[in-house]
Amino acid sequence: MIIIPAVDIKNGKCVQLVQGEPGTEQVVIENPAEVAKQWEQKGAKKLHIVDLDGALGSGRNLSIVKEIIEKTKSPIQLGGGIRSVSDAKKLLEIGVNTVIIGTMAIKNPEIIKELSSEYGCERICVSLDSKNNKVVTHGWKESTDKTPIEYAKLFEKMGAGSILFTNVDVEGLLNGINLEPIKELLNNVSIPIIYSGGITSVDDLKVLSDIGVDYVVIGSALYKGLITLEDALKYQK
């Protein structure tokens, strides 16, 4: 299991939101590129970047993404507001290792086949955000009629190299995790699962490692000091 610190960018700053809601910023740090560099220096092997302005439909933080790429050596996975094939290609071509595609993939699954054919499966990740066991889109504002498992099977066939699974019901609340949806995903697809949402302690990491999760994204718990990256990395295999 690989531990991936999150760097969420909004209005040019590193922030942490509660359940993705604008106006709920609980952590605000001025320089996202420096934050990313510090996580790398502390041992992170991969970085998870979220352009919240992109995800919320209010613009992009492309210059900051470029700065993070320049200042760090670790592979970067990036999501948030990728609304077209050209958006995805631009990010892949400036040095983002893996693009995380959510709403666009749900609307047009064939895009995943196109991108994975051109750039390789390992560079294409599909984000499945789950609320009440239904996949939600458009920054968690709209609900679909399909479960995460239904979509995960579809995108595995389409050539996605990994699935980022976020349980919106627990995301940012620091109340711990719900294992059942993750176990179901692990039992139904063979591509790597990246888990995000509700992690509060190293005990959560131990359980996720024990059930076979491949990657874990940690945000709020790191920024609020509930877990240190040093302790989290003890569960890295």
From Swiss-Prot:
Cellular component terms per the entry's GO annotation: cytoplasm
UniProt xrefs under Pfam families: His_biosynth
Catalytic residues (positions): D8, D129
Subcellular compartments: Cytoplasm
Pathways per UniProt: Amino-acid biosynthesis; L-histidine biosynthesis; L-histidine from 5-phospho-alpha-D-ribose 1-diphosphate: step 4/9
Annotated catalysed reactions: 1-(5-phospho-beta-D-ribosyl)-5-[(5-phospho-beta-D-ribosylamino)methylideneamino]imidazole-4-carboxamide = 5-[(5-phospho-1-deoxy-D-ribulos-1-ylimino)methylamino]-1-(5-phospho-beta-D-ribosyl)imidazole-4-carboxamide
Keywords from the named record: Amino-acid biosynthesis, Cytoplasm, Histidine biosynthesis, Isomerase
Molecular function GO labels: 1-(5-phosphoribosyl)-5-[(5-phosphoribosylamino)methylideneamino]imidazole-4-carboxamide isomerase activity
Disulfide bonds: none
SUPFAM superfamilies reported in the protein's UniProt record: Ribulose-phoshate binding barrel
InterPro entries according to UniProt: Aldolase_TIM, His_biosynth, HisA_bact_arch, Isoase_HisA-like, Isoase_HisA-like_bact, RibuloseP-bd_barrel
GO BP term, pick one: L-tryptophan biosynthetic process
Signal peptide: none
Enzyme Commission numbers on file: 5.3.1.16
Family of this protein: Belongs to the HisA/HisF family.
Listed name of the protein: 1-(5-phosphoribosyl)-5-[(5-phosphoribosylamino)methylideneamino] imidazole-4-carboxamide isomerase
Species per Swiss-Prot/TrEMBL record: Methanosphaera stadtmanae (strain ATCC 43021 / DSM 3091 / JCM 11832 / MCB-3)
Taxonomic path: Archaea, Methanobacteriati, Methanobacteriota, Methanomada group, Methanobacteria
Encoding gene (name): hisA
